[in-house]
Amino acid sequence: HWTVRIANEDGKNSAWAEPAMWTYAGLASNKDWQARWITHNASSPWLRQTVELQAVPAKAYIYINSFGYFQLFINGKRVGADEFTPHVSQLNKRTLYLTYDVTEHLTEGKNAIGLWLGQGWSGATDTRGWQAMPSPAVRAQLEVANATGQIATLVTDDSWRAGESCLAYSGRWKWNKFGGEV
């Protein structure tokens, strides 16, 4: 929590403002991740998990870290408007992650969380033919706070369902290819 007050040019202080708090700080280091990396042997897989919540969350954030592109869906609706996310990463040094406030997307009861993955930069090759990863991979960590402040953490693990999407290729510097006949 934090608060502020203002001093005017005569040195007179205002009253303290109402206490406030940072909404979230994110995951500061690799040790903060409880999620496991998951993938499916396809260039553009769909990954899905159902989670059941006892009540509508007071706050909920999801952190997503991926090799390759991803799009997040909750209860059939896309979260965020980003395309080809995350942006360019130097995969031998770091991977970028994004945080979404998903409070408004979750409901009491069953919630379907879906992740579409695309090859993107995970399929990058160098001049010697080295490839970063044969298939895109992701780890996601959903932190849900109830009205009393208790936090439940839901993570990617081997219980997620996986399947191949109709997108045949989504890589760097090439147009997407859609295989609608599948």
Language-model regions, residue ranges each:
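N-terminal flexible segment immediately upstream of the FAD-binding catalytic core
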Residues: 43-44
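Accessory beta-strand-rich segments of carbohydrate-active enzymes
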Residues: 1-3, 8-10, 21-28, 47-182
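N-terminal pre-domain segments of enzymes
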Residues: 23-40
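Short Trp-Ser/Thr-centered turn/loop motifs at beta-strand boundaries
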Residues: 13-19
